[in-house]
Amino acid sequence: MRTLMIEPLTKEAFAPFGDVIETDGSDHFMINNGSTMRFHKLATVETAEPEDKAIISIFRADALDMPLTVRMLERHPLGSQAFIPLLGNPFLIVVAPVGDAPVSGLVRAFRSNGRQGVNYHRGVWHHPVLTIEKRDDFLVVDRSGSGNNCDEHYFTEEQMLILNPHQ
């Protein structure tokens, strides 16, 4: 099994998969009579159908045992999905390009610094949320509407990957 190398999360490196949601280096302007900086349009919510709605949820995630064998990835073909850490803790991101099925050799891993969120574009393969802390909270922005919006792909034993945050 191939061990994934964990990359720092940057806008440039993550661009094929979605948006990095962060204030560092992002354009902003002043509002509220000069008392507030607005970091505008850090990500775009995608929905497939006009009747779909963008919704906001909170996910409370428990850590998985590490090193982790990556056995599956999921995708949301009908909308984007954003994860913004609420407690400031670093977390891990595992992604693969849009396609009929994820290609094991194209899977990449990233580490958020805890002040960065991610917005997966429609159809991007990704592992469910991966917290490093025992328990962590995330603000999630995704889509509500009709139709199946979660496909799962399970790797064969030869395709499985290892994720080790302590490397």
Curated annotation (Swiss-Prot):
Signal peptide span: none
Catalysed reaction equations from the record: (S)-ureidoglycolate = urea + glyoxylate
Short name of any one Pfam family annotated for the protein: Ureidogly_lyase
Keyword Cell division recorded: no
UniProt superkingdom: Bacteria
Keywords from the UniProt entry: Lyase, Purine metabolism
Annotated function: Catalyzes the catabolism of the allantoin degradation intermediate (S)-ureidoglycolate, generating urea and glyoxylate. Involved in the utilization of allantoin as nitrogen source.
Name the UniProt record assigns to this protein: Ureidoglycolate lyase
Lineage: Bacteria, Pseudomonadati, Pseudomonadota, Gammaproteobacteria, Pseudomonadales
